Every structure is written in C-alpha cells, then in structure tokens.
Amino acid sequence: MQLNSTEISDLIKQRIEQFEVVSETRNEGTIVAVSDGIIRIHGLADVMQGEMIELPGNRFAIALNLERDSVGAVVMGPYASLAEGDKVKTTGRILEVPVGNGLLGRVVNTLGEPIDGKGPIEHDGFSPVEVIAPGVIERKSVDQPVQTGYKAVDSMIPIGRGQRELIIGDRQIGKTALAIDAIINQKDSGIKCVYVAVGQKASTIANVVRKLDEHGALANTIVVVATASEAAALQYLAPYSGCSMGEYFRDRGEDSLIVYDDLSKQAVAYRQISLLLKRPPGREAYPGDVFYLHSRLLERASRVNAEYVEKFTKGEVKGRTGSLTALPIIETQAGDVSAFVPTNVISITDGQIFLETDLFNSGLRPAVNPGISVSRVGGAAQTKIIKKLSGGIRTALAQYRELAAFSQFASDLDDATRAQLEHGERVTELMKQKQYAPMSIADQSVSLFAAEKGYLKSIELAKIGDFEASLLSFMNSEHAELMKTINDTGSYNADIEGELKASLDKFVETQTW
C-alpha cells in the first residue's frame, strides 16, 4: 500500500488534533545533599520562593534558591537526622506565626511557639512573616510622641509613633539598656511592645525578661527569641516574625513599639545562609540583597490612617489610626558607622541615636552624642512643653563640645566663653540618667526648666544629680497637681511657666546647695 504526500499530511494533522497533553505537577521531591543546615532537593517542580517544605519528622525548610534542576532550602532547626534520599513535600504556603493579645507577656521562638514554660498560647489567628508594607496613600504623618523616659532622647532626639529610629554604637555601651527602658516606659501608655532578640546569649535574654517582669512591663510585651545557638534560618527570620506580631496591633487601630536587638547579627545570619547557598558575595561578603533584607522589614513600621484600619478590620474599628514604631539596633566595630550594614540602615531609618564609647567611659549614661544623633520626623511629634524647654539644650551641648575642644589650646578665656563652658558642663551632667529609671514628662520638664532658666548656675557640678533628685521629690510632693496637669496635657503656657518658676524659686530659697 502506497500513501501519497497529501494523505500522509492529513494523517499527521489528524493525529496532532487527537493528541492529549497530560501534565502532572510534582509536589514531592528527594533530598540529594545535606550540609550546614542547607538541603538540596531534586524533583520539586511545583514550589515557590519562600514556600515551606515539609520534611520527615514534622520539620520544615524554606525554599530560597529555585534553580533549573534543584531547589536550595534552609532547614528551620536541627538537621542532623536528615539524609540523602529522604522524601519531602511542598505545602503550598509560606511561613506564618500566631498573632494576638494572647502573646503579650510571653516568650516565644521565631515560629511563635512558647519557650517560657507557661503552657500553650491563646492566639487570634496566624499572619505571614513576609507582608508587603502599607502604601503611601495608606499612611499618615507622624505627629504623636513615643516617650522613652530619657531626657537626652526625648528632648533632643524625639521619637514619634510610626517612626524608625536607629540605635547605633559599639558593643557594651548601653544600646539594649536604652531600648529596654523605652519598653518599660510604655507600661502605662497603652503602647504594646515587641522585643526581638537575635543571636544573643540565652542568659542575657533571661536577664532582660526578668527585668521587664520586675518593672511591670512584661505583661505588655511579646519577647521573640532566636539565640546564638539556634539555626541561622531562625535568626534571619526572627525580626520578620516579631514584626508580624506588632503589625497585628497596628492594623487594629492600636499603637505598638518593636525593638530589633540587633540587625547586625541578623545580617550575619543571612550572609551565612547566602554563602552556603552559593549566592555570589559582594561587599564584606554580604549578598547583593542585604539592603532589601532590612528595607522590607523597616518599611513595615508606619503610622496607618483610619481608612486602612477600617478596611483591614472590615468595619469593626472606625476612626482610629494605628502605628508600629521600630527601634532597630546596629552594633558597630570601633565606632565605624561607614561600614556596609550601618550605612544601609542609617539610610533606611528616620534618624539615629549614636552612642559613643568615649562618652560612656567618661561616665555619661546614656552615652548619646547629640552632635551626630538626629530625628528626622520626631520633631513634629514632640510634646509641646518638652519642645519649648529643650530648644536651647541641644545648642548649649553643641557649643560646649566645640568650646571644650578649643579651650584645651587656649590659655585665656573671656567671661562669655567661660559661662558657656560652665553651662554646657551642667547640662551634660543633668543629662545623666540611671538605668531602669525612665522619667515622666513632668519630671523631664522640671529638669529642663531648671537648666533653661539658669537655676543650675550656682550648683556645684558634683551635686547636680542630688539637686535634681531633691527638686523632683519636692515637686511631686508639694506640687502634685501641677505635675499631673503637665503629664496629662503636655502643654506649655504662661500659667504653667509662672507656676514652675514660683515652685523652683521656693525650692531654691528653702534648700541650701
């Protein structure tokens, strides 16, 4: 039998039309390599970036590298029992953590599991750890203050609700102490707090939790922990988990504060993961997307408008704005703020509080350098009375540091210069503050008023601290009504100024210094 070309062509067309394409998505793969917490999987055709992959023994990994013939994933926890040939499955979901009021007062790990021995957590649902930050239209400008309780910060570097304010400095100079005191100061303010500890010793974290409990702030705080001994993947993801827990309050029209302690260690953990995944290294061996690592996290801190809250809660909450304020911490090496990660985070945040080793060693606690510390948006949120009284404080300190350096070379100083130096010395001494002793708005106002109006001129430098303590004790006992008014309203007018002046005049007359 012979077929001509036309018949052959028709037959081929007919077969093509009848052919059915049968495709089967594969969601099961095989581990082909295990090393240093990284697994390489073959056979996963249906997997997305950041997806949770189910491993044997009820464990999970996260897919980070999607390559032509394999998937690189990082294991969330111990990996010693995993071996080549083990079967794994895709789950179709990304990592989620529990959120809600039930987490307040608890210590949890990166996955939101309790590690404080207080039993299971009653949560209000789950939230993905990776969430797109609110857009420009959904945001509201920062105009409400977050009081840290530190005179040096609240007067010169004010922080607003929804702001990102970096705390930067060398190791062991009070970065965590400043952040913890800020959390302690929120116990009666209604601001919910989240403290994220990344890459720290378990004993250090236990001490922080104990201090928060002692000062009555733990009931208002969620502590998220990824210790130095835990997998790099958990250290890398801990800030995102804590952020999702803080966003729960923001999206329901409440105010929240989150401390990331610290993002340097998170960047190191991410660098470790990236190098093990054989991603190309860049400056200081960090991967190319280390800026995005921090920017997508810190952009989630914001103040959102009432429409956003109403839309998110489906009309349950109306007319209320919400905020998430971030205090990221960065550790520098020998004061080098021009290193890769510090410059990245400085450019992302709305200002920085720079702590200096020399100031710390000279006895100034908190060791804030007012010259290079700045708050780019907090000024609009500053309490009126603090804003009015602190105007000359920053100038006095800046002039003092400049003149102090100059006076070392000058043998003879005129009276005006000497007066400026003496005033600067007294203001510097007044800015000293003990740890775990945050001050109220009224207490800060009285101290700043005394400095601004010249009440410290006749006080010996060594007695400034005692003078301040006695003055505040006098004001809170003899003029409690005035102090309550200042705390409640935060306003400053001629009446309040007159009362403060009369009170301080009376104190100076009755006391000998």
UniProtKB/Swiss-Prot annotation:
What kind of membrane protein is this, topologically? Answer: Peripheral membrane protein
Q: Which reaction does it catalyse?
A: ATP + H2O + 4 H(+)(in) = ADP + phosphate + 5 H(+)(out)
Q: What class of enzyme is it?
A: translocase
Any GO CC annotation of this UniProt entry: plasma membrane
Q: Where is this site: Required for activity?
A: 373
Documented EC number(s): 7.1.2.2
Q: What does this protein do?
A: Produces ATP from ADP in the presence of a proton gradient across the membrane. The alpha chain is a regulatory subunit.
Q: What is this protein called?
A: ATP synthase subunit alpha
